[in-house]
């Protein structure tokens, strides 16, 4: 599969060959679902906590006698039926974390990259940086490729200047080639990849797959 490499001015420069084992797979939507669900679950703090009837502070005294008042029966003021009483089956702190098998996670990332590459969502840009670190300079580049869409920028290294220039753009997020996130890739309307990052992504997943198979 070939993709056109664009300059920062939006001019087509050359073609780059995308690795079919990473960018040309049939899309497995099942593993994509599990990968996104895992990421979102792992972000949950799980700190929600309510008090049950036995934990609410208060007297255990019966508020009035059982019979003869014409009112409903009451055991104590901590009843879940009363304001300020305990909560029935309320949430308690819990751990929502669950880890996907590494092989499944890699398949999800490759499926997402293939999904974006097979459409028009993925664009390859020549390597560049924003020397000034200014947002306006990065916007001049982005306006050729994304018009206010939710955009993901995949970098080949930790470019502090480029990230500084983009941190004021709410629709833009940066990912490293070896730390992709399924949620960002799936919901990104545009995926911009630096040319070097394309090769690094392919090398990274090839080496991981080879290590898994015992051939690396």
UniProtKB/Swiss-Prot annotation:
Region entry Disordered, spans: 51-78
InterPro entries linked to this entry: Ribosomal_uL4, Ribosomal_uL4-like, Ribosomal_uL4_dom_sf
GO biological process, one term: translation
GO molecular function terms attached to this record: rRNA binding; structural constituent of ribosome
Pfam family, one: Ribosomal_L4
Family: Belongs to the universal ribosomal protein uL4 family.
UniProt subunit comment: Part of the 50S ribosomal subunit.
The protein's name: Large ribosomal subunit protein uL4
Gene source species: Treponema pallidum (strain Nichols)
Lineage of source species: Bacteria, Pseudomonadati, Spirochaetota, Spirochaetia, Spirochaetales
């Amino acid at each position: 599969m070939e993709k056109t490499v664009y300059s920062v001015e939006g001019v087509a420069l050359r073609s780059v060959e995308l690795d079919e084992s990473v960018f040309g797979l049939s899309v497995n939507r099942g593993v994509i679902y599990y990968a996104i669900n895992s990421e979102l679950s792992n972000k949950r703090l799980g700190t929600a906590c309510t008090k049950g009837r036995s934990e609410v502070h208060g007297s255990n005294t019966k508020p009035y006698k059982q019979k003869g008042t014409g009112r409903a029966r009451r055991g104590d003021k901590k009843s879940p039926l009363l304001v300020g009483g305990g909560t029935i089956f309320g949430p308690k702190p819990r751990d929502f974390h669950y880890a996907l098998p590494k092989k499944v996670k890699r398949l999800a990332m490759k499926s997402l990259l293939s999904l974006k590459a097979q459409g028009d969502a993925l664009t390859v840009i020549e390597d560049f940086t924003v020397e000034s670190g200014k947002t306006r300079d990065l916007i001049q580049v982005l306006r050729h490729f994304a018009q206010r869409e939710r955009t993901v920028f995949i970098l080949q290294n930790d470019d502090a200047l480029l990230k500084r220039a983009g941190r004021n753009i709410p629709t833009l997020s940066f990912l490293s080639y070896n730390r992709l996130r399924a949620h960002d890739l799936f919901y990104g309307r545009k995926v911009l990849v630096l040319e070097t990052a394309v090769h690094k992504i392919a090398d990274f997943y090839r080496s991981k797959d080879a290590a898994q198979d015992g051939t690396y």
